[in-house]
Amino acid sequence: MENNNLGLRFRKLPRQPLALPKLDPLLDENLEQWPHLNQLVQCYGTEWVKDVNKYGHYENIRPDSFQTQIFEGPDTDTETEIRLASARSATIEEDVASISGRPFSDPGSSKHFGQPPLPAYEPAFDWENERAMIFGQRTPESPAASYSSGLKISVRVLSLAFQSGLVEPFFGSIALYNQERKEKLSEDFYFQIQPTEMQDAKLSSENRGVFYLDAPSASVCLLIQLEKTATEEGGVTSSVYSRKEPVHLTEREKQKLQVWSRIMPYRESFAWAVVPLFDNNLTTNTGESASPSSPLAPSMTASSSHDGVYEPIAKITSDGKQGYSGGSSVVVEISNLNKVKESYSEESIQDPKRKVHKPVKGVLRLEIEKHRNGHGDFEDLSENGSIINDSLDPTDRLSDLTLMKCPSSSSGGPRNGCSKWNSEDAKDVSRNLTSSCGTPDLNCYHAFDFCSTTRNEPFLHLFHCLYVYPVAVTLSRKRNPFIRVELRKDDTDIRKQPLEAIYPREPGVSLQKWVHTQVAVGARAASYHDEIKVSLPATWTPSHHLLFTFFHVDLQTKLEAPRPVVVGYASLPLSTYIHSRSDISLPVMRELVPHYLQESTKERLDYLEDGKNIFKLRLRLCSSLYPTNERVRDFCLEYDRHTLQTRPPWGSELLQAINSLKHVDSTALLQFLYPILNMLLHLIGNGGETLQVAAFRAMVDILTRVQQVSFDDADRNRFLVTYVDYSFDDFGGNQPPVYPGLATVWGSLARSKAKGYRVGPVYDDVLSMAWFFLELIVKSMALEQARLYDHNLPTGEDVPPMQLKESVFRCIMQLFDCLLTEVHERCKKGLSLAKRLNSSLAFFCYDLLYIIEPCQVYELVSLYMDKFSGVCQSVLHECKLTFLQIISDHDLFVEMPGRDPSDRNYLSSILIQELFLSLDHDELPLRAKGARILVILLCKHEFDARYQKAEDKLYIAQLYFPFVGQILDEMPVFYNLNATEKREVLIGVLQIVRNLDDTSLVKAWQQSIARTRLYFKLMEECLILFEHKKAADSILGGNNSRGPVSEGAGSPKYSERLSPAINNYLSEASRQEVRLEGTPDNGYLWQRVNSQLASPSQPYSLREALAQAQSSRIGASAQALRESLHPILRQKLELWEENVSATVSLQVLEITENFSSMAASHNIATDYGKLDCITTILTSFFSRNQSLAFWKAFFPIFNRIFDLHGATLMARENDRFLKQIAFHLLRLAVYRNDSVRKRAVIGLQILVKSSLYFMQTARLRALLTITLSELMSDVQVTHMKSDNTLEESGEARRLQQSLSEMADEAKSVNLLRECGLPDDTLLIIPEKFTENRWSWAEVKHLSDSLVLALDASLGHALLGSVMAMDRYAAAESFYKLGMAFAPVPDLHIMWLLHLCDAHQEMQSWAEAAQCAVAVAGVIMQALVARNDGVWSKDHVSALRKICPMVSGEFTTEASAAEVEGYGASKLTVDSAVKYLQLANKLFSQAELYHFCASILELVIPVYKSRKAYGQLAKCHTLLTNIYESILDQESNPIPFIDATYYRVGFYGEKFGKLDRKEYVYREPRDVRLGDIMEKLSHIYESRMDSNHILHIIPDSRQVKAEDLQAGVCYLQITAVDAVMEDEDLGSRRERIFSLSTGSVRARVFDRFLFDTPFTKNGKTQGGLEDQWKRRTVLQTEGSFPALVNRLLVTKSESLEFSPVENAIGMIETRTTALRNELEEPRSSDGDHLPRLQSLQRILQGSVAVQVNSGVLSVCTAFLSGEPATRLRSQELQQLIAALLEFMAVCKRAIRVHFRLIGEEDQEFHTQLVNGFQSLTAELSHYIPAILSEL
């Protein structure tokens, strides 16, 4: 296996991860005569063989960062904020980079709009973790980790210091010791400490001892024993080190000690100490649940016996910087060593009061470091193929955990060590550590762990030695005894040298012939504490023995160095005592003679102390070669005989030995498991049928027991996994492979079962252990395949698949079939064994794909699929899914051929079929599982570095593309999924489609129109399900009422839009948070000096508690869970969600663009009449919350789509689509973010351009007006100011700006460039057109129309709460809305009806009636324009006379611009008649009967055309009543007044738009001047603030700006009179209406006047001679009655009349009134009462003589004295003529009055005659001619 090719498939791993010397040179001898030993040595000694393909491949692509996606709202501008923040701080990039995501090495990304959606959906994809969730998933085991799962502790001696000074060398040993059980747990680690002046560079003072421990325990401690040179008699005694008072050695004493230590080779016990390692109150677990603050031996720091001091030291990496390590080290100062006063024993170690031993005045400093003995150790070793002393030396690099393919190896990332340096010594430590990094193996001694010989674990390494512990020798007198120990082969020749089998204490020295113990100085009962390690031979005879020689040495310096004297000998035969664990007592011989072991010789020997057993010792055998169990030894012996064929081949002894293996105790069975399995496999491969079956049955029994006795619950026992994965090598190719024999014997057993034979309970055991045999068969095949092509394969080429022999393959097929049958039958019974067996069969096929011809694997897979075909029970279907998921994870799965040579993708097609069946399954968990499998497989392809080429991605996409077809064929299946499953399917569809080429993709759109529609339904679902919403808006459950079934009930759900795996990832991350600093891993049961590190910081623990509390609550909200996350995790989550939404939208946009291009060439099947696929997806884009990146990519595509398909998209059939697009473009035009807003403007221009070419602009105006109206209810156009008044909002301003920019030719080019469109986008002429129809004037007209509608809506909104109080403003607002939305008849009518209702509430009947007439007019005009009504243009003109607002300007266009849901389709004759009747009713209430008549005349033609005679009768009855009412009004002596009119002027800034404007108000006839003053004061006082007051100007004079005060708002209210159409406004007469003046005229007024008297002499008042008059005529914007109560004064003219003209006018006015009364015709002569009353009233006011009143006052003023001289002659003559005419008419009236009166009025008539005569007499004084005239 030294060649490269074998290494392509298998990796050789060194077996021995420990740096130990070569164990036994005796093993080099020839072992051919002991085949079982050969097996053992080969099992332990050869390198492991690891199949690198077995657990799959996955090479993750380079991690990359997600881009922050910006999702803007109407009032946000995150883009600008981020840009400004970036400008302020350059470090923000580093922060963003820390939130990394999945890489996007998308080779074809240039043709794509965005990154693929899958990485954002699965940002934390963990291939190993996903595989681990498969039922029956096999996970790799690391052998070293699986057997030493506890702790590794390293100890290094730093220094030894005494109060009296360190002069002589000291030696010592350290071992792990269990105080409770009083036993050593490890062998000794030796060290020595030389005085400074005696140090030698070669001494290993830097040595480090490494100890292994299963689990922390309070009783585990370090036992430290110190030795020094045996004390010289009469020399300096060891008591100098323990005296209480300070002792200082003299120079002579120091010299003497140094000389003595050099010549004396023997040592004595000096002191000892016990150092507890762990807390007293900890539990004996393996550490995961231990408290992170558990200290390392608090007794060291606080106990009375060991006043130790702890100092954390920093880890130093090889570059000198502080680094990270899995370990933590402490420096321990042991200040109280116990001096050995006399021989001590284990009991004295337990003595708590230290009565026997004095304390030594010295300090021993140790550095103790712990390491997790985890997977990293072994992997570091195995991946590099060489032994590395990992993490023992802190200067070594960290174990590369990422090399592990085992998910359990992740321990939460690097951990911080303590970085504080506490002393100079710590620096020395670091210096020493650094200096030792060159040869780490030489400086570490791995002490053998005695527990490894008693654990229920297989032996992995070769160890074969005996530990000898001399305990005591009891002599009759005091001596200085010590013992020499040696191993001899026999006792024949006592002069023969012993075997070199004793391990030395010094490192790096070869095995020695003997070793000496300590000297027990002056002892009668000498005790020893030595540990002697003896290397044993591979096999031993009864003559192999240990020989102990006892010496006495004189401890005095004479002429030469002291020589020891032999005292006696003792021997111990190995074969007799090798198994003994208790104390052994031996007699001591005085002399040694040949054959001293033989019983006959022993009788002649002379013994010390009368032959008593005075020598006591202990033995500890540690061997992985020599089984202590007798049955195992018997099996080995019979195996040897069978192999060497020393017995007949049918030997029943071997069968018996094989069968007896089932009775071996579990410990022995486990310890020798691997060699036993190897030997049984050898028998299965090479033995006869009987032997094969026996060996197979024994093997099954052993495997079952191993599975039962191991303490883990895994389906695949870790010991067996290690055997298959590492240890099993199929005999290194030296023997035929195992798999044919194994398959044969197993297959025969299976077939026997299938035939119904009784095969015993062993068969069920075979099934439960089937995974083991299947993996053995596979590895055996793989090894054979590798060796077959070992030498003839060019370097670097893949090993070709191996064609199995027909017989072997048939056997495997039969076996597979039998096992399948078992799965099928047992699944139906619901047995979990069936599921495990199913997974094992899947992995069997998975493995075979690497080894044998895929066609042969196809046979197995198709056999499986035939057995499980179609829809089956949920348990069976789940098994089938698991089977497919396992095989599909294979690297070669895309190449697996079928039976037909053209069928290269059998597996992918069957996978797609079964996944779809899963989605359609009744069982909800199976749906979730099917969807999940799809995503996981796609993730593996997408994120695997080996599949990044474009052709690979295309090939994989083509393989999966039929899945999209399946979905389209069975859409109800998709709709029946819940939201989570839908997302899984859709993300898979998007990923598949993304990597497809256009040729493949177009196939999905070529089959049928319905199928293409369904495809885009899927795209719509993508946009819906992945829409980005705020976390607060998300709901815990999906769209479907049932939640995702794939997750456990306790699994919290942080996000809906991301993969379900993310929830587990975040849950785990939340739990790990608390470990970020000061975790159980970092402070694993070790002392923390810094109390702040003893527990995690508060926020972390609070967050973790909250997360746990939230996850434990049923139905905890996703928002609460998100809040419980660490901010970094929450930021990651939001980033991922933003990206998945953005990437999905961009991907759908990319698909839409492709579709649009294909549709242009008519290559696909779609509805070319409407292009509904494009319209629905575009609408869906707009209606979802999209990222800024999307909008930037969208509008060029939007423009391209309208260029290609403008004619279709702008057709009437797509009105609904256009309306929605227009709505969303206007909505985006409101956005604060300029990038979005400007693109919306471009979108509107694109729509306008298309309308100019493909439709009427009027239709687009109607569309945009409609959408603007709808938008007003969505957008907040006002906001409250601090003074609680409303003002225009930013949204409204931005919309106004956007509508203006739409028509701004100057900004157009820059706008297009900013949005990534060509400069001439708007000028490009579409195909089939020759002229450029783009017109900025048209766009401007459209823009102005929309701005008008916006202003009206804004004005209406700004009224707000004022509307209820200020009914005038409210009505005006409704009116403006009605006019602004006139392009849309429905909206126009809606606002007019609102206005009508408002007027009715105010009882303004005439105005309400006008609204109804206007509505009817809109409908009538539309009907006339369509020529489908009963009316003509003459009727419209008649209606316009009633309501001049009825105009043809808008409605002609609007009737043509019908939009779906709006427009002329709802305008019918019936609705017009309805509103005409409403107007008739309202005019009746207003008593304007002449309007009622006109309206009924418009209704009558309708009934005539329909021959509705009943209705006609009613109409004529109504007309009769109306004309009678008109007659009543005319015959009433009191003139009929329908309304009063008032001029109101507004002056003041608080009036806003009303400031400096005048209005004429139309009020009910009973409203007087005081009433309207009060009403308006009430309205406008509420609008004043503390800085403004309201003032009413009391007169009607002209207001001058300089007269107005700041802070005062003025109202000027004046009563005005309506002016008739033909009235002479220049007449000086006073205006007194009688019935005769307007009886037959329509009461429609648009001019008004009022007269204002004034003087020119400065006086406020004067006589008639000074009284001038100003007549003001006002022209209003429209005519009354109007749609509103007030109209703006557009024109104001004034006339002035002199005082005499005033007087003449007054007289002429009275004359005319009287003459009119005399000449008025009456209906009958008898009807004289009204006339009499009217005549009496006029005469009484004309001829009653009163001082300074009437006619007489005029004469007095102008015809007497000085004023008469000022009159011009013409004026004088006019005045006299007027007076004479007046008197003549009065005389005539008196005569008429006499004819009309009765008796009762005679007295009144007499008064009139007297008054006339008196008046004539008075006037004659001024006008003498009057007497003659009358």
Curated annotation (Swiss-Prot):
Molecular function GO terms recorded: guanyl-nucleotide exchange factor activity
Segments forming domain DOCKER: 1379-1828
Chief place where the protein resides: cytoplasm
Domain of life assignment: Eukaryota
Topology of this chain in the membrane: Peripheral membrane protein
Pfam families xrefs: DHR-2_Lobe_A, DHR-2_Lobe_B, DHR-2_Lobe_C, DOCK-C2
GO cellular component terms, semicolon-separated: endoplasmic reticulum exit site; endoplasmic reticulum membrane; extrinsic component of membrane; nucleus
Residues recorded with modification Phosphoserine: S1051, S1095
Keywords of this entry: Acetylation, Auxin signaling pathway, Cytoplasm, Developmental protein, Endoplasmic reticulum, Guanine-nucleotide releasing factor, Membrane, Nucleus, Phosphoprotein
Residues recorded as bearing Phosphothreonine in the entry: T1079
Subcellular location: Cytoplasm; Endoplasmic reticulum membrane; Nucleus
Keyword Protein biosynthesis: no
Region Disordered, residue ranges: 285-304
Modified sites of kind N-acetylmethionine: M1
Signal peptide location: none
GO biological process: anisotropic cell growth; auxin-activated signaling pathway; cortical microtubule organization; petal morphogenesis; positive gravitropism; regulation of actin polymerization or depolymerization; regulation of auxin mediated signaling pathway; regulation of cell shape
Function, as annotated: Guanine nucleotide exchange factor (GEF) for Rho and Rac. GEF proteins activate small GTPases by exchanging bound GDP for free GTP. Controls actin polymerization via the two heteromeric complexes WAVE and actin-related protein (ARP) 2/3. Involved in cytoskeletal reorganization required for cell shape (e.g. trichome and cotyledon) control and tissue development.
Family: Belongs to the DOCK family.
Quaternary structure note: Homodimer. Component of SCAR/WAVE and ARP2/3 complexes. Interacts directly with ARAC4/ROP2, ARAC1/ROP3, ARAC5/ROP4, ARAC6/ROP5, ARAC8/ROP10, ARAC9/ROP8, SCAR1, SCAR2, SCAR3, SCAR4, ABI1, ABI2, ABI3 and ABI4. Binds to the inactive GDP-bound form of ARAC3/ROP6.
Domain notes: The DOCKER domain may mediate some GEF activity.
Full protein name: Guanine nucleotide exchange factor SPIKE 1
Organism: Arabidopsis thaliana
